[in-house]
């Protein structure tokens, strides 16, 4: 079942992953971010919001 979401968020990695717990690294990777200043458009779903909440200190969100 495929859902189309009108709401998307732009997520940008603003801090390095050096010294960050491995679970937080995995969350950043799940958002599709690899390097500092990488930006990715993601669907605005509860699952994505949870990932962003977990790593809020590493990313910047733009609507």
UniProtKB/Swiss-Prot annotation:
Pfam families: Ribosomal_L30
Top-level taxon of origin: Bacteria
Record GO cellular component, one term: cytosolic large ribosomal subunit
GO function terms (MF aspect): structural constituent of ribosome
GO terms, biological process: translation
Entry keywords, A to Z: Ribonucleoprotein, Ribosomal protein
Signal sequence, start to end: none
Complexes and interactors: Part of the 50S ribosomal subunit.
Family statement drawn from the similarity comment of this UniProt entry: Belongs to the universal ribosomal protein uL30 family.
Name listed for the protein in its UniProt record: Large ribosomal subunit protein uL30
